[in-house]
Amino acid sequence: MKKKSLTELISDLKGNENVVNWHEIEPREAKTRPMPESIDERIKAALSKRGIDELYTHQYSAFQYVQKGESIVTVTPTASGKTLCYNLPVLQSIAQDETNRALYLFPTKALAQDQKSELNEIIDEMGIDIKSFTYDGDTSPAIRQKVRKAGHIVITNPDMLHSAILPHHTKWVSLFENLKYIVIDELHTYRGVFGSHVANVIRRLKRICRFYGSDPVFICTSATIANPKELGEQLTGKPMRLVDDNGAPSGRKHFVFYNPPIVNKPLNIRRSATAEVNELAKEFLKNKVQTIVFARSRVRVEIILSHIQELVKKEIGTKSIRGYRGGYLPKERREIERGLREGDILGVVSTNALELGVDIGQLQVCVMTGYPGSVASAWQQAGRAGRRHGESLIIMVANSTPIDQYIVRHPEYFFNRSPESARINPENLIILVDHLKCAAYELPFRADEEFGAMEVSDILEYLQEEAVLHRNGERYHWASESFPASNISLRSASQENVVIVDQSDIANVRIIGEMDRFSAMTLLHDEAIYLHEGVQYQVEKLDWDHKKAYVRKVDVEYYTDANLAVQLKVLEIDKTKEKSRTSLHYGDVTVNALPTIFKKIKMTTFENIGSGPIHLPEEELHTSAAWLEIKTADEDIGEKTLEQLLLGISNVLQHIVPVYIMCDRNDVHVVSQIKAAHTGLPTIFLYDHYPGGIGLAEEVFKRFSDINEAAKQLITHCPCHDGCPSCIGTEIEGIKAKERILQLLDQMS
């Protein structure tokens, strides 16, 4: 049978009735500038061997700004040569003066390893003795000593910087005395709690640099987000120059939204996205068109992989289709990456591990199983197809979830608007106090010293009263025997964490993670299904007193969702927007939450297939919230009906908030109350699910009119009769729920 070309397959797809939007991105010519004359001849020769004799405009701009001592954030698409934006000035600096040093921060170990091998290839071709080392948990003690003394370029991650480098800075004197550049790659991944912690780690890093007499320039790179310059400045505390004049070429891209057919009309349930992805990928692979499939979890990766291998084993054999996810050994991952670059591997099914800048060469087709959760992630994944020249195809196959349905019905949101803003709150008191402890352990604090832009004398006095610090004249010294960084996780806002223990293999019981207490109530109760790096675990026992959750690997087709009985108390109102019938506020609240029952929800249809009780004590959370009060409701709506309508609105808002604010669905909780304690009015609260808040609720307050408009659009365009899991929740009998909810949302806008 004659193989079809990609062009023919694209033409066939145009006739598919499930294609709901077809967006074409025109090809773009390269925009280049000559190689700057100041660049060392050995670097020019090494780049020339790799076919690089000119620079793209963004690489040229980045080099010029950094040479002037400006800190920069470079924002260009995947595979546009961002790495040269930092490698070039760093290598130039060390070629000019071999005492100069650079620190590279990557969010994952895999990415650090990948960048190290690319960097070492250039260094080898330069013929200069520049030593670059990765420094992570796998680095052997013998190598560690070498890195500290002789590493020109130290490649690590924020967790190692926080717990292994900064507390032992006296062993790293040659790095800190001569540190010229700090590179932060994949800046957009530093958001929420993690980003708020990392901003404080950077404050500690800058403090130690000042102590050793260095003032490094920051070179950041980011995927496309709405606020890269602002995020870079918040994270580093330095003014940033934005470099976004992308000069890299790209071929024609077809970006297709595909909505599976409805199989249950009353409930508006569609055929599973996984089944559609299998069929679509099969067509490309059997015609030998190199394809990448993205799935949200490891379990889904393995399911799709086995299905596709089965579907195409006669045509191309199973060896040329591989899975790729965290948990694979580095050797195996390198082999898959090489196979993709060289064309021996035709298809790969991956979690978002391949979203970040690992070099896998040029693929022709990218298929996404569902919306990846943010516009930035979707564009990162799309960038994996047609990385250099030639035509490419991206297909996003929608799930039945409200957020997926909103995206495929509103392509203009996806293609025309700026993507989401990444939010951090380095001043979160719990996070800030933790890092002040670490900073005081590293170097004594002067009484008048600032940390970031904050005066911290009150906090230092408090820590002295708690006997954590000891004051001697004008300085505060660390007074405790303990080592603070080892007890502080960068992934959690509160350090009173529940440790998650995997006992799937009794001979190899291991800790796989931790979670703050407040989240653990709803995500780690007995019988909960917990997802860790895409693997499903069931909680066999939550030992609340000793803060341990014992889990075992399972493979099930449902997830669990806990009901919380929530009492909210408003502590302080900071901002208000008044409308004739509603008021929108932002401020501080306490949340008293008691988990009551959990439900088992089927992944494909969102049906409730079982439930059980949760026996845990009440917990209190101090956080920030945005809340909307309805001052006057229509008189013909009874209290019971209004309560149901508020629940419906809450369901929609819970799904829509992550479309506008870069966060996961569980980061902002939505709770409705028919009579709020402080006013007696019907109220919907949207609160940060982290102690102290991390800036998400404030962003909800700022962007509420956009969020409200999106909620109305979602309900209006949902084809169900009067409510379904894809919009306001299951049907509310006999009250014209959709119509009335739209009226209420109109009053709020």
Curated annotation (Swiss-Prot):
Which Pfam families has this protein been placed in? DEAD, Helicase_C, MZB, WHD_HRQ1
Presence of keyword Hydrolase: yes
Q: Give the domain of life.
A: Bacteria
InterPro entries, per the entry: DEAD/DEAH_box_helicase_dom, Helicase_ATP-bd, Helicase_C-like, HRQ1_WHD, MZB, P-loop_NTPase
Domain (Helicase C-terminal): residue spans on this chain: 276-430
What top-level class of enzyme does the UniProt entry assign?
Answer: hydrolase
Q: Coiled coil located at which positions?
A: none
Mention one GO biological process in which this protein takes part, according to its record.
interstrand cross-link repair
Domain (Helicase ATP-binding): residue spans on this chain? 63-243
Please tell me whether the keyword Nucleotide-binding is annotated for this protein: yes
One of the record's GO molecular function terms: nucleic acid binding
Keywords assigned by UniProt? ATP-binding, Helicase, Hydrolase, Nucleotide-binding
Q: What CDD domains would the database entry show?
A: DEXHc_Hrq1-like, SF2_C_Hrq
Where the record places motif DEVH box is: 185-188
Name the PROSITE patterns for this protein. HELICASE_ATP_BIND_1, HELICASE_CTER
Q: Which residues bind ATP?
A: T76, P77, T78, A79, S80, G81, K82, T83
Q: What is its EC number?
A: 3.6.4.-
Family assignment from sequence similarity: Belongs to the helicase family.
Q: What is this protein called?
A: Uncharacterized ATP-dependent helicase YprA
